[in-house]
Amino acid sequence: MATQVKKELVAELVEKIKKAQSVVFVDYQGIKVNEETLLRKQMRENGAEYLVAKNRLFKIALKESGVEDSFDEILEGSTAFAFGYNDPVAPAKAVFDLAKAKAKAKLDVFKIKGGYLTGKKVSVKEVEELAKLPSREQLLSMLLNSMLGPIRKLAYATVAIADKKEGSAE
C-alpha cells in the first residue's frame, strides 16, 4: 500500500475510534462470507460498523487517538473491528452471538479477542458480559414500565373504588 493511502486509512480509523463508544476486537478467520455479510448488516441496523484493517495501522490509529492502553497481544493474527457508535452493547452483542453459534457448532473460528470501552481496555470476559446486557432501548422500556406500574395500579384502584361506590349507590 502507498504511504498516502496508509495515512488516509489511519486518519479514518482515528476518526472511528474517537466517535465509537466501544470497539470489539475479533479473530475473524474461518467465517463464511454470507455470515460476515449478515453480521455487517446487523451491525449497520444497530448503529455499529464491522471492518477489517491491518493490525499495524490500527495500533498507529490507537496511539493517535490518545488511547494509552497497549493492545499488542490482542492485535496479532487476523483481526476485525466492530465499532459501536450509538449503543456500546450492540457490537458486543452481534459479535458474541456469532461467536457463540460457532462455538456451539464446535468450530474453532471467529473468537472475541477483547475490546475497548469508553476509554479503557476490556477483556474477553468483560466483552461477553457486556453482550449479555440488554440494549439501551430495552433498558429504557424496562425503566418506563417500572415507572408506569404504580400509576397503572393507582388508576385501577380508583376505577374499582368508583365502581364500588356506584354499585352501593344503586
From Swiss-Prot:
Transmembrane segments annotated in the record for this chain: none
Superkingdom in the source lineage: Bacteria
Keywords tagged on the record: Ribonucleoprotein, Ribosomal protein, RNA-binding, rRNA-binding
Alphabetized InterPro entries for the sequence: Ribosomal_uL10, Ribosomal_uL10-like_sf, Ribosomal_uL10_bac, Ribosomal_uL10_bac_type
GO molecular function: large ribosomal subunit rRNA binding; structural constituent of ribosome
GO CC field: cytosolic large ribosomal subunit
Gene Ontology process terms (BP): translation
Presence of the UniProt keyword Cell cycle in the record: no
PANTHER family for the chain: 39S RIBOSOMAL PROTEIN L10, MITOCHONDRIAL
Subunit structure and binding partners: Part of the ribosomal stalk of the 50S ribosomal subunit. The N-terminus interacts with L11 and the large rRNA to form the base of the stalk. The C-terminus forms an elongated spine to which L12 dimers bind in a sequential fashion forming a multimeric L10(L12)X complex.
Classification via NCBIfam families: PRK00099.1-1 (NF000955)
Protein family membership: Belongs to the universal ribosomal protein uL10 family.
Protein function: Forms part of the ribosomal stalk, playing a central role in the interaction of the ribosome with GTP-bound translation factors.
Protein name: Large ribosomal subunit protein uL10
Taxonomic path: Bacteria, Fusobacteriati, Fusobacteriota, Fusobacteriia, Fusobacteriales
